[in-house]
Amino acid sequence: MRIIAKKDLFINDEIRVREVRLVGLDGEQMGIKPLSEAQAIADDANVDLVLIQPQATPPVAKIMNYGKFKFEYQKKRKEQRKKQSVVTVKEVRLSPVIDKGDFETKLRNGRKFLEKGNKVKVSIRFKGRMITHKEIGAKVLAEFAEKTQDIAIIEQRAKMDGRQMFMQLAPIPDKK
């Protein structure tokens, strides 16, 4: 069902057409009726007449409880927003000449981020003449990837960008 924004809907007295293709409360087609008759049917049922497709010829109007429709729509939207998960990218910065203890600390932080469901960008910044030894940086990134392979997949392989080498890891999606 296509949901229409409020500014696209015309309700009861806002409808300015001569005749409409009328759809009843339970979705049955009631045929093409003059607007006054459609309005009377809606009033008898104590509900609203809503123009849901003004571009059609003749325009389509539905008899419904607009307040309930709006409430259900907002409830669905809220439910959809709850289901959305916001994935953020966290960054772990390393050095090509990182010490073992520092590496373990950065690795622990990266694992925490991955376990929380965040993506991790692992970057190495080359300073001075270190840029001539890119293979050392690649080795550090490979070791980081190897030690997180049980909880992460490599989303973007190691690549150079100026004086920086980086790769991106993503948590392994749950198999349901």
Curated annotation (Swiss-Prot):
<dbReference type="GO" id="GO:0032790">
    <property type="term" value="P:ribosome disassembly"/>
</dbReference>
<dbReference type="Pfam" id="PF05198">
    <property type="entry name" value="IF3_N"/>
</dbReference>
<dbReference type="InterPro" id="IPR001288">
    <property type="entry name" value="Translation_initiation_fac_3"/>
</dbReference>
<dbReference type="GO" id="GO:0005829">
    <property type="term" value="C:cytosol"/>
</dbReference>
<dbReference type="Pfam" id="PF00707">
    <property type="entry name" value="IF3_C"/>
</dbReference>
<dbReference type="GO" id="GO:0003743">
    <property type="term" value="F:translation initiation factor activity"/>
</dbReference>
<keyword id="KW-0396">Initiation factor</keyword>
<dbReference type="InterPro" id="IPR019813">
    <property type="entry name" value="Translation_initiation_fac3_CS"/>
</dbReference>
<dbReference type="InterPro" id="IPR019814">
    <property type="entry name" value="Translation_initiation_fac_3_N"/>
</dbReference>
<dbReference type="InterPro" id="IPR019815">
    <property type="entry name" value="Translation_initiation_fac_3_C"/>
</dbReference>
<keyword id="KW-0963">Cytoplasm</keyword>
<comment type="function">
    <text>IF-3 binds to the 30S ribosomal subunit and shifts the equilibrium between 70S ribosomes and their 50S and 30S subunits in favor of the free subunits, thus enhancing the availability of 30S subunits on which protein synthesis initiation begins.</text>
</comment>
<dbReference type="InterPro" id="IPR036788">
    <property type="entry name" value="T_IF-3_C_sf"/>
</dbReference>
<dbReference type="GO" id="GO:0016020">
    <property type="term" value="C:membrane"/>
</dbReference>
<protein>
    <recommendedName>
        <fullName>Translation initiation factor IF-3</fullName>
    </recommendedName>
</protein>
<dbReference type="InterPro" id="IPR036787">
    <property type="entry name" value="T_IF-3_N_sf"/>
</dbReference>
<comment type="subunit">
    <text>Monomer.</text>
</comment>
<keyword id="KW-0648">Protein biosynthesis</keyword>
<dbReference type="GO" id="GO:0043022">
    <property type="term" value="F:ribosome binding"/>
</dbReference>
<comment type="similarity">
    <text>Belongs to the IF-3 family.</text>
</comment>
